[in-house]
Amino acid sequence: MKGEVVVIPFPFSDLSRSKFRPALILIDLPGADAVLAAITSTGSEPNAIALEQADFLAGSLSHSSYIHPAKLFTFQKSLIQKVVGTVSEAKRKEVVARIVSLLG
């Protein structure tokens, strides 16, 4: 699971409904949860990391995207809709290194 790009239901800020969005699994926790990083199509955040087709070992996203290491969350694995790909170990380590840097 670690390093997989998955599609999950992501709630709107007012919790009125949700939209399916990609996320990167960083930690497959024992039990029902995993720690994920948000993936979006915009990289306006200073810590966003570009995710290109070349970063995938398998699968892909439909267009260039950005992993947001400052947007981490715990998510119930049973709610994952599908796996769309797996990123390279180098890309996963880049994300983890950025998280460590952010933590200071």
Q: What are the functions of these language-model segments?
A:
Residues 1-104:
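Conserved functional hotspots at enzyme active or ligand-binding sites that engage polyanionic ligands
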